[in-house]
């Protein structure tokens, strides 16, 4: 039992250095600002951001050094003269820098872990597309999945208490508590409805970091159960004794942490080694080769785990048991499913010929065209029916700037949805963006589309027709010698680290 407790509290006894003094360092805000722009895939050009200029950061740090200017009132933050005067300005810069600071201890642990395991090219594993080869290799063999909507804490104080195990700096925790209570909102941060302002973007990163730290607490229990049970498949005498001892430890673990009274009657709950867990945003997927009864046991276990150990009210109706053969998963902007691919094999023995019908399971990924068109309509690129329109807010920009913005949007969407099994939906999205670009340019020059194209020529839109730039990728289908064959195959890129706002339909 002591061994299990030490595992669940791994590295929590290690005190971290104080992080609060880093808030007063100028280079922290420079790093945070550069990281936000370098990882951005938004349609806007970064340009010059006066809200993050060095002069403003110096003025901000000077005001924080002044006495009684950085006091936090628990009841009303408007009483604070520091935030009351420049709330919409300083409150955007400080959370961005503070989010960069609190990630430092976790980044150091991640680097040391990758170096210890000698993982080569670990940056490729950060790509969102790297998860799809895993689904291709494993999901076609599974039968059922648990589609889970992860519950969130009823109060942000639960999130702060989670980080107390890792951060021993009381000042940083108090400042974190202030930011969470003042600026964060569950609905707008976890499930953003649309691409918000820079204010929401800056505060969202801090909130998501704290939220993911909280979710990791109960995910670590899953990892422990999975890693221990996966090594108990041998039937040798030594491992058999270890297996019996492990099941005994599991009963005590669940009785202490989860309080499942009937766990002894369901020992098969953790004996299934072929299980896979995936989480994205507020959803998670638990796939297995087991039966429907086995998945119902896991459903009851998850509900009890959250309610008893993590004090989270969770309704069983938030967990759906779906059969992969009859259900599609809305996963990271794709509709993923496992469909049967029928084939006929002709076999001949001497003078007798036979036709054998064979069906092979195939992992399929499609682009949901309707939600994507709705996202383009909200961004004012087209109507709700998919008819391209002009972008009035960009009409005052230069022609090259307008074309560059549309080109980057088209390139980002093409890269992100390059793994689609069919390219028809992608062709339609490119058509909408191209015609929207032409209409925007025609609106700027106060001409019709036909007149504008006749005077400008086809060279103006050649940016859209240029081939994609070379980036690392891999495909699932057999390679072709022609570009046409490569374009028809599914391509997964290794340089995509965040979901495009237009592809995020939630």
Curated annotation (Swiss-Prot):
It is found in: Plastid, Chloroplast. The keyword DNA damage does not apply. Disulfide bonds: none annotated. The gene is matK. InterPro entries: Domain_X (IPR024937), Maturase_MatK (IPR002866), Maturase_MatK_N (IPR024942). GO terms for molecular function: RNA binding. Belongs to the intron maturase 2 family. MatK subfamily. GO terms for biological process: mRNA processing; RNA splicing; tRNA processing. The keyword RNA-binding applies. HAMAP family: MatK (MF_01390). Keywords: Chloroplast, mRNA processing, Plastid, RNA-binding, tRNA processing. It comes from the Eukaryota. This is Maturase K. GO terms for cellular component: chloroplast. It holds the Pfam family Intron_maturas2. Its main location: plastid. It comes from Avicennia germinans (Black mangrove). PANTHER family: MATURASE K (PTHR34811:SF1). Usually encoded in the trnK tRNA gene intron. Probably assists in splicing its own and other chloroplast group II introns.
């Amino acid at each position: 039992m002591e061994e299990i407790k030490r595992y669940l509290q791994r590295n929590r006894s290690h005190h971290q250095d104080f992080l609060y003094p880093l808030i007063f360092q100028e280079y922290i805000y420079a790093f945070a600002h550069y990281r936000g722009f370098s990882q951005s895939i938004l349609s806007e050009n970064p340009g010059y951001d006066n809200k993050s200029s060095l002069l403003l950061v110096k003025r901000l740090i000077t005001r924080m050094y002044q006495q009684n200017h950085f006091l936090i009132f628990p009841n009303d933050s408007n009483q604070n003269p520091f935030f009351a005067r420049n709330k919409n300005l300083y409150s955007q810069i400080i959370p961005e820098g503070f989010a960069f600071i609190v990630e430092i201890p976790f980044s150091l642990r991640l680097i040391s872990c990758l170096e210890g395991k000698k993982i080569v090219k670990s940056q490729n594993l950060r790509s969102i597309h790297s998860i799809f080869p895993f689904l291709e290799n494993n999901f076609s063999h599974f039968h059922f999945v648990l589609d889970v909507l992860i519950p969130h804490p009823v109060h942000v104080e639960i999130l702060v208490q989670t980080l107390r195990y890792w951060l021993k700096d009381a000042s940083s925790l108090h400042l974190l508590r202030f930011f969470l209570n003042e600026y964060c909102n569950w609905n707008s941060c976890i499930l953003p409805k649309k691409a918000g302002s820079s204010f929401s973007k800056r505060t969202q990163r801090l909130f998501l970091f704290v939220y993911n730290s909280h979710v990791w607490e109960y995910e670590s229990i899953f990892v422990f159960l999975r890693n221990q049970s996966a090594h108990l498949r041998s039937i040798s005498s030594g491992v058999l004794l270890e297996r019996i001892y492990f099941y005994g430890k599991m009963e005590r673990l669940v009785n202490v942490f989860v309080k499942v009274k009937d766990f002894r009657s369901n020992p098969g709950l953790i004996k299934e080694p072929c299980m896979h867990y995936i989480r994205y945003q507020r959803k998670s997927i638990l796939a297995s080769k087991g039966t429907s009864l086995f998945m119902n046991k896991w459903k009851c276990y998850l509900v009890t785990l959250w309610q008893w150990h993590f004090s989270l009210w969770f309704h069983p109706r938030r967990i759906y048991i779906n059969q992969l053969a009859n259900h599609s998963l809305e996963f990271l902007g794709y509709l993923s499913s496992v469909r049967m691919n029928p084939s006929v094999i002709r076999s001949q023995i001497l003078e007798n010929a036979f036709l054998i019908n064979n069906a092979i399971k195939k992992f399929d990924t499609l682009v949901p065209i309707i939600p994507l068109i709705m996202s383009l309509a909200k961004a004012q690129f087209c109507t709700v029916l998919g008819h391209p329109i002009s972008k009035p807010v960009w009409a005052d920009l230069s022609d090259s700037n307008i074309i560059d913005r549309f080109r980057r949007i088209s390139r980002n969407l093409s890269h992100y949805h390059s793994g689609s099994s069919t390219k028809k939906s992608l062709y339609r999205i490119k058509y909408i963006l191209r015609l929207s670009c032409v209409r925007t340019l025609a609106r700027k020059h106060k001409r019709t589309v036909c007149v504008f194209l006749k005077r400008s020529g086809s060279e103006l839109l050649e940016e859209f027709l240029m081939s994609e730039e070379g980036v690392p990728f891999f495909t699932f289908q057999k390679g072709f010698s022609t570009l046409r064959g490569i374009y028809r195959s599914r391509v997964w890129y290794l340089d995509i680290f965040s979901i495009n706002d237009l592809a995020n339909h939630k």
